[in-house]
């Protein structure tokens, strides 16, 4: 591992531990040349997932893009950045565990909405409005009515 301070390639590992719920290894290293200490992370290389956009265009799944959209929808809702990271982590893990290497953007949107539904109604509606391309107030109303119907069904079961 190359030292970020002097670019020497010889270092020793001082400490190793599991990180990110066991999905990576965090290593504390010391450069043998300048004694600078730095941290590295070792992760399993994920097989790329291809996202099929609405227009048929294909692109590699971009975790940052999804996290950014989720962050925008969840502004001022009380959901913490770590919770949003957890949502994206869970979604990415389920995509990696899937037998398919392709997924539509619609399927990703529905997966995100299923996570948001139980966490924040406001974030759910905001994300749905962008993802489902709401064009009028009636689109918002029908989504809210659907959420209320789901609540009524749950209340009837209890």
From Swiss-Prot:
Keyword line: ATP-binding, DNA-binding, Metal-binding, Nucleotide-binding, Repressor, Transcription, Transcription regulation, Zinc, Zinc-finger
One biological process term in Gene Ontology: negative regulation of DNA-templated transcription
Keyword Repressor included in the entry's annotation: yes
Gene Ontology MF, one: DNA binding
Domain ATP-cone: 49-139
UniProt cross-references to InterPro entries, sorted A to Z: ATP-cone_dom, NrdR-like_N, RNR_NrdR-like
Transmembrane segments: none
Cofactor: Zn(2+)
Domain of life: Bacteria
Role, per record: Negatively regulates transcription of bacterial ribonucleotide reductase nrd genes and operons by binding to NrdR-boxes.
Protein name: Transcriptional repressor NrdR
Native source organism of the sequence: Synechococcus sp. (strain CC9311)
């Amino acid at each position: 591992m190359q030292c970020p301070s002097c670019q020497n390639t010889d270092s020793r590992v001082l400490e190793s531990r599991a990180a990110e719920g066991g999905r990576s290894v965090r290593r504390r290293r010391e450069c043998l040349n300048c004694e600078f200490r730095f941290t590295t992370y070792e992760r399993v290389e994920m097989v790329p997932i291809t996202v099929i956009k609405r227009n048929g265009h294909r692109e590699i799944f971009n975790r940052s893009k999804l996290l950014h959209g989720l962050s925008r929808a969840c502004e001022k809702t009380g959901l913490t950045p770590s919770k949003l990271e957890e949502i994206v982590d869970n979604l990415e893990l389920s995509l990696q565990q899937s037998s398919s290497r392709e997924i539509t953007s619609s399927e990703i949107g529905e997966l995100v909405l299923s996570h948001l539904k139980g966490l924040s109604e406001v974030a759910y509606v905001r994300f749905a409005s962008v993802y489902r391309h709401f064009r009028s107030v009636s689109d918002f109303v029908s989504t809210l009515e659907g959420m209320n119907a789901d609540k009524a069904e749950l209340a009837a079961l209890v």
